[in-house]
Amino acid sequence: MNKFLNEKLMPVAAKIGSNKGMIAIRDGITLAMPLIIIGSLLMIIATGFAIPSLEAWLNDAGIAAYLWKGSDSSFGLIGLVASFGIAYSMTKQYGVDGVPSGIVSLSTFIVVTPFVTGEAGNGMPTTYMAAQGLFVAIILGLINGWVYQWFINHNIQIKMPESVPPAVSKSFSAILPGAALIVG
């Protein structure tokens, strides 16, 4: 059995593991790991470590509500962070600055998130920014990262003179790929 695994499955697994898209997904979701751990710890504490009397005390004292808010806030950003991280990682693998790509990916993620209207007002439900929107975040992160690097590597960008500070120049170089991704 080990021979079969080593000779047949390991080369396939190594090939899949070295794919740029898979690396970007791994790194992007790993970027959200602190939020996942913090949210999980707050959830464990809010439930009183599965001790009913401790859970009741936390609820009665009003502490559980704050813990749940922290947990929900942490888990509620996983999709957004993954979208940024996946685009960032994908772009970096092509030798391009990943931060603008990640920011554009955040914007496209918000563009595809449905808005709601009602008596309470207009807004964007946060449920899609959490794990419920993770699949969309993965797809958008991969597409944004690849398209962004393609624009930059094919010099489809606004070039500034050398006298312009590098941070400003990088911002201008992100305008064309960013606009194409956000509008497209």
Question: Which residue ranges define each predicted feature?
Answer:
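Signature of multi-pass transmembrane helix bundles
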Residues: M1-I37, L42, I51-E55, N59, ...
